[in-house]
């Protein structure tokens, strides 16, 4: 898989979420939106990510993990193939990703695509990004040849700083 324009490279359709009650004061049209560039900056600079997966019994499993942005795509490192999160993703690739800050919230709903035997260019880019972001961590380009690295294909992104800035972006289905 070579580097190229990723799923996050083009701003998806922006709209208001359906869920806030009218009493929250979120306008149905117009008003203040979060800018897509802000979402990309938050996803790129975040120290860590929380990933929510689904167990075989349908229960949520949420854990913090490391990740990075490379070539307009979000990549998340999930550790050894036998971890709960990896087993969950292998069975059901649906995920929710969110960042720590409740006052500057960014959440991504999508699907994980496991990467194995990465081409040299992507392996080098991921190893460089991860070692640059996480001090003391020094992966090699082939560190994920047996699994443990997932590219996130976003379907919906939600973000808000405060009411009434709730913003939702919807991506076109790939293919």
Predicted regions and their residues:
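Charged, gly/pro-rich active-site loop segments
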Residues: 2-33, 103-175
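Short, basic/aromatic recognition patches
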Residues: 22-50
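A generic local structural motif
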Residues: 35-38, 62-63, 82, 137-138
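Tryptophan-centered motif/residue detector
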Residues: 36, 50, 66-69, 160, ...
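Amphipathic alpha-helical interface surfaces
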Residues: 39, 85, 122-126
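Short beta-strand segments
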Residues: 46-81, 87, 95-99, 107-111
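Generic structural signal for secondary-structure transition and capping sites
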Residues: 47-48, 94, 135, 157
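Phosphate-coordinating loops and pocket residues in cytosolic domains that bind phosphorylated ligands
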Residues: 91
């Amino acid at each position: 898989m070579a580097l190229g324009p990723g799923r996050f490279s083009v701003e998806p359709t922006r709209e208001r979420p359906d869920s806030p009650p009218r009493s929250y004061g979120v306008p149905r049209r117009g008003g203040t939106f979060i800018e897509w560039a802000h979402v990309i900056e938050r996803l790129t600079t975040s120290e860590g990510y929380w990933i929510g997966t689904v167990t075989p019994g349908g229960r949520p499993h949420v854990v913090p993990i490391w990740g990075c942005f490379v070539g307009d795509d979000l990549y998340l490192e999930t550790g050894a193939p036998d971890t709960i999160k990896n087993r969950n993703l292998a069975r059901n690739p649906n995920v929710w990703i969110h960042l720590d800050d409740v006052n500057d919230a960014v959440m991504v709903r999508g699907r994980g695509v496991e990467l194995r035997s990465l081409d040299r260019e992507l392996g080098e880019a991921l190893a460089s990004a991860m070692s640059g972001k996480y001090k003391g961590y020094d992966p090699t380009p082939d560190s994920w040849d047996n699994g443990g690295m997932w590219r996130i294909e976003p379907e919906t992104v939600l973000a808000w700083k405060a009411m009434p800035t709730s913003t939702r972006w919807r991506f076109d289905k790939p293919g």
